[in-house]
Each structure stands twice: as structure tokens, then as C-alpha cells.
């Protein structure tokens, strides 16, 4: 802004509040946030990829893969992007198996391997026979699923090489 920019694009999750704060102080600059928000300002707008479609398709695959209809989802936090993923995944699974249920464990963190592993273990031990995840650290979940023979879905990274026997797919922005 100090260099004369009239458009600012904020691309990082977690920058929403800061972007809105700066937008309110600079009404002559247009701010564009890549994410979800219900905030509305004359110089502030949001956009997010339509991730519900690929999550719905992954849910359909999960519905075809699961023998029990009990699906697990390791999620970071109940923020809009994550909730869209969970709901779309479950609706897709229910398209195939009307009785499918998605059991969710929120870790409260994006990148805590220990919490992610604990959450995946909890879901598997409760009878979930397919696991999906929305975490920034997929490796511990994928490794656990590979060792347990549990089909797994990912988010934002194709890590098929880590779990060639159980990897199904991932939702990745391209």
C-alpha cells in the first residue's frame, strides 16, 4: 500500500482478520481474500475454489469402499473450509450408502502429528473402515492407515507413494 498498490490479494488461511483490519483502514484499496468469510465490506471480497465437488466425489468413493458405512474424518478445526469438506464427503458417501455416517475428530491444530495420529487411531478403533483427513501433516495418518490396511483420502497433497495399498484419492487445488 505504501508503494501505491490499489489491489491486495491475501492468500493465506489465518490472515482474514488482519486483511479486514487493513481494508477498514484503507478504503481506497481493494482487498481480495482467498478463503471463506461472511464479512462484507465495500473494498473487501472473498473467493474460494469449489472444493465441495471433489469432496463429494471422494465421499462417493468412500461409500463404495466402506463395508460398514462407518467413515472417519480427521479434521483440524471447525472452520468453513473444513466443514464444507466434511459435509460434502458425507453427502457423497450417503449417495452410495444412505446409512453411511462420517465420524469426525477435530484435532484443534493444522500440523500436530501426535494429535493427528491419536485422532486417526481413535476413529479406527471405533470401527471406521475408511479415513479422510483435512490436515497439513497427512503423513502420520496415511502411515497409520497403510499399516492398518485402512483406505485413506487426503487433502492438498497426493501422497500415494506413502500408502500404495490403501490410498484412494485426495482433494488438491491445482
Language-model features: locations:
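A residue-level marker of the well-folded mature domains of exported/periplasmic proteins
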Residues: 1-174
Amino acid at each position: 500500500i505504501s508503494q501505491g498498490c490499489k489491489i491486495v490479494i491475501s492468500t493465506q488461511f489465518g490472515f482474514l482478520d488482519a486483511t479486514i483490519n487493513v481494508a477498514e483502514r484503507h478504503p481506497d484499496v481493494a482487498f481480495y481474500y482467498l478463503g471463506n468469510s461472511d464479512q462484507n465490506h465495500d473494498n473487501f471480497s472473498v473467493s474460494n475454489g469449489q472444493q465441495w465437488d471433489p469432496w463429494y466425489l471422494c465421499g462417493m468413493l468412500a461409500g463404495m469402499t466402506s463395508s460398514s458405512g462407518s467413515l472417519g474424518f480427521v479434521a483440524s478445526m471447525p472452520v468453513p473450509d473444513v466443514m464444507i469438506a466434511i459435509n460434502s464427503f458425507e453427502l457423497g458417501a450417503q449417495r452410495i450408502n444412505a446409512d453411511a455416517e462420517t465420524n469426525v475428530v477435530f484435532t484443534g491444530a493444522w500440523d500436530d502429528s501426535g494429535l493427528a495420529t491419536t485422532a486417526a487411531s481413535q476413529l479406527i478403533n471405533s470401527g471406521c473402515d475408511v479415513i479422510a483427513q483435512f490436515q497439513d501433516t497427512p503423513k502420520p495418518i496415511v502411515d497409520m492407515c497403510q499399516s492398518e490396511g485402512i483406505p485413506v483420502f487426503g487433502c492438498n497433497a497426493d501422497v500415494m507413494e506413502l500408502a500404495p495399498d490403501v490410498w484412494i484419492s485426495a482433494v488438491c487445488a491445482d
